[in-house]
């Protein structure tokens, strides 16, 4: 596989882009783990984001045929895959811009997104997944992002983004991936995750509220919110929900934070 990749680089004068997070998967065990994870959830449709040189795509197209599609932004990679492997089951497009729902005529009951997400846009792609009509996702992300998505309350990685994702999604780790599984090797390890939507509508107001409440981790909720809400009402809401007046955002679960958001929204 390494020889094939190097041959592609040479023949196409291709240099992997750090900005686009172009690290190509070469570990067959990891490829098998991804494909097995996708197959296990019995997807009605499979959308692969950034298939690269097709390490995962090759197996997915065999298993899911017309129920599979890929999106690739890089023109050289797109043409390579379209000509040699995916044959009109790939779009040359920006995954952040295109409407994922429009790719298939009918998404069915369990549409699933798959991808090795570039670090610099992984949070945007995850939010787009939350807002989309897709139900599940099998994603590879840098370990740092994985820690944020899996973070427990009171941990250093627990953030507004953690709370937002965990309120909307069930997040579980499948496996950690060494740097050596990719070419070129990234500087950090990656994590393979399974995301599944909860039956909860996305709330834009709650997203804004989380950004405010996590503004400064050292400050209490009261101090972070007092410029946007009446301090008396903040205390009233905290006490009515059984929280301490000196509570900090990282001490509360995503559900508790949403309860506080709802309480303040009704009072203010």
From Swiss-Prot:
Keywords: Cytoplasm, Methyltransferase, RNA-binding, rRNA processing, S-adenosyl-L-methionine, Transferase. One of its GO terms (cellular component) is cytosol. CDD domains: AdoMet_MTases. Its EC number is 2.1.1.182. Signal peptide: none annotated. It is an enzyme of class 2 (transferase). It is found in: Cytoplasm. The keyword Methyltransferase applies. It catalyses: adenosine(1518)/adenosine(1519) in 16S rRNA + 4 S-adenosyl-L-methionine = N(6)-dimethyladenosine(1518)/N(6)-dimethyladenosine(1519) in 16S rRNA + 4 S-adenosyl-L-homocysteine + 4 H(+). S-adenosyl-L-methionine binds at residues 23, 25, 50, 72, 94, 116. It holds the Pfam family RrnaAD. The keyword Metal-binding does not apply. InterPro entries: KsgA/Erm, rRNA_Ade_diMease-like_C, rRNA_Ade_Mease_Trfase_CS, rRNA_Ade_methylase_Trfase_N, rRNA_adenine_dimethylase, SAM-dependent_MTases_sf. One of its GO terms (molecular function) is RNA binding. Specifically dimethylates two adjacent adenosines (A1518 and A1519) in the loop of a conserved hairpin near the 3'-end of 16S rRNA in the 30S particle. May play a critical role in biogenesis of 30S subunits. Belongs to the class I-like SAM-binding methyltransferase superfamily. rRNA adenine N(6)-methyltransferase family. RsmA subfamily. NCBIfam families: ksgA. PANTHER family: DIMETHYLADENOSINE TRANSFERASE, DIMETHYLADENOSINE TRANSFERASE-RELATED. This is Ribosomal RNA small subunit methyltransferase A.
